Amino acid sequence: MADHDPHVRQRVVLLIDGLGWHQLRDRTAIAPTLAGLAGTVITSVAPTTTATALTSLTTGMCPGEHGLVGYRMDMGSSVMNTLRWGDERGDLRRTHAPADVQPCVPFMGVKVPVVSKAELEDTGFTEAHLRGSTPRGWRVASSIPVIIEQLLAAGEPIVYAYYDGLDKVSHERGFGPHYDAELRACDRLVADIMASLPDGVALYVTADHGQVQVGGNILQQPTEVMACVARQSGEGRFRWLHARRGAERDLVSACIEVHSDVAWVVTRDQILEEQWFGPVVRPAALRRLGDVALVARDDVTFDDPADGGHFVLQCRHGSMTPAEVEVPLLVHVAQR
C-alpha cells in the first residue's frame, strides 16, 4: 500500500459516509473512478453506525475504549442521540461534556485539517471525535477538491475529508435512481480530487459502513418482550434492550423466542466475551450498553417509539451483515 511508498510525501483521507463495499462492487459501471482504484475490502466496527465508526477512525481506538458505542446511548438520566449530542430536552454538552464521554485524543494529538460541512463544525459530536483539529468547512461539495488542494499547497502532511451525501440519499430514497445519481456524483468528486493532487500525494478513500434496504419492514416489540424492557437504545438494526430490574433472564428468553429467526439475539456478556467492541471496554462504556442486543440478520429494523424521524428510512445500517460491515479501502498515489 502507499504507506510503504517512499514516493509519498503527503496523504489525504476521504471518508464517504455509507459507501459499502458490496454496493460499490455491484455498481462499478456507474463509478468507474472508484472501481479503477487499487485497494481492498476492510471491516468497520460494531455497531456499523456513523458516530461509532468515525470516532474509531479518528482516534484509532475500538468502541469499547472511546466509548461512543452506538447511535443512541443510555447515559443514565436519558438516552442521548450521539450525532445530535442531545435528547428530547435539547443539547447535552453541559451535562455530558464530549471530552468526558469520549476521552481518547483524536489524531494522536496532531492538529489535522478537517474538510467537512461547515454546519457540522460547532456540534457536540464534532467536539467528541474531532477536537483539536483545524476545521476547514465547505458549503457545497464542489469546494472539497479546492480546499484539499489549498491545504496540500500549504504543506499539510495529512488532510481528512468527510462527505455524507450518499448516506443521506440512501436513507431517504433507498437503492435506485437517486442512489445511483449520488454515487456518480461521489465518483466525480473523487476524480476531481485526484486531478488536483500534486506529485507524491496519496489519496485513501474509505467509509464507515454500508447499507441494506429495509423500507417498511419495521418490527414492533410484542407484549411479552416489552413487559421485560425498561428502555431501549442503539438503533433499528442494532437495538439494545435494557431490562427491568430482575427481568434479565426473562428478556433473553422472550427475545430468542420472538426474534431469533430474523436477528442475532446477543447478551451483553456474550458481546463482551466475544470482544465485539474490542478487547477493552471502559466502565463508562459498559454502563451505556443494554442487557440484550437485537442485531438484525434479515432486512428488518426494530422499532423504538422514542427513536422516530420525519420519514421512514429506506436503507439502514448498524448490524454486522457483510453488506453493512464491509467497506472499501481504495488508494491512489499521484505521479506527475
Model segments located where?
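Feature captures the catalytic ectodomains and active-site-proximal regions of enzymes
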Residues: M1-R336
